[in-house]
Amino acid sequence: GDSDTEPGVKQDLGVATARYLRHVLRDGDILAVTGGTTLAQVADFFPEGSDSRQVTVVPVRGGLGEDVKIQANTVAARLAGGLGGRYRLLHAPEDVLPGHLNQMLNEPRIRDVIALGRRADILLHGIGTAEEMAKRRGFDEAAIMELIASGAVGEAFGYYFDAKGNIIYSTTSVGLRLADLEKIPLVITVGGGRSKAWAVQAVLARGYCDVCITDEGVARRLMSLEGIEKYKEDLHEH
C-alpha cells in the first residue's frame, strides 16, 4: 500500500519497524533516534513496560518547535518506556543562528547527549521531502522555491539532497551531522508514501543507510524511476 493515500499503511510501517528494532537491539546498546510523524508512529508500538532491556535511547536532533508528540525527545522517552530502558533528553532547538552554534554545542548537557549519540550502535531516523522540511523550518515561499529549483528532493539531519545524494544546502542544526553516520554500525531509515520516493532515493544514493524500511508506494515509484533512468541510458548509448 501507499502511506500517502492509506492511513493504515503508515501503521503497518510502524509495526514493521518496531518488529525489526526488537530483533536487532541487544542489551547494552545505545539507540539514537530522530523525530517526525513516522517515528512517532513507531513509538506507538512500544507500549509502556512491554519489554525489559538494558538499552539507552538518545535523541540526536533538536526540536523544531512543533507538536511535542513528534519531537525527538518525546520519541526517545516513549521508546525507552516501551523497551524498559533509559533515555537522555536533548534540550536544544534544531536550528540556531550560525554564530551561536559552537556556544550551544559546548554547553555540557548538550555536548554530552550528542557525544552519546555519536557512540550509538543503532540509529533510527525518518526522512522528509525537501519541501516538507523547509516548511517545517519556517522557510519563506521564495526560499522554498529556490531550494526546489536547485534540485533538492529530500532532507535528513539538516542536509538537503538532490536525487543523486549530493548536498544542495545544509542548516546550522544541533544534533548528529552526516559524517557521524559513517561510524554508526547500523543505520535504519524509515519513510513511506509515494511523495517521499525521491527523498528515499536521495538518502539511499548518499550511501549511509544500511536498512531502509518503506512501503509499496515508495518501492513501486523507485522501480519506475529506475526504469526511466535505464531507458534514458539505453537511448544515450544508441
Task: Locate the predicted segments by residue.
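HTH-adjacent hinge/linker in prokaryotic transcriptional regulators
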Residues: 1-32, 43-52, 63-69
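Acidic/glycine-enriched edge-of-secondary-structure segments
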Residues: 3, 29-35, 156-166
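Secondary-structure boundary/capping motif
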Residues: 28-30, 53, 121-122, 185
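Glycine-rich beta-strand-to-loop/alpha-helix junction loops that act as flexible
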Residues: 33-38, 192
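Short, flexible active-site-adjacent loop segments at beta-strand->alpha-helix junctions, enriched
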Residues: 37, 61-63
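Short Gly/Thr/Asp-enriched flexible loops that form oxyanion-binding sites at enzyme active sites
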Residues: 38-50, 135-144
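Conserved phosphate- and dinucleotide-binding cores of soluble alpha/beta proteins
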Residues: 63-238
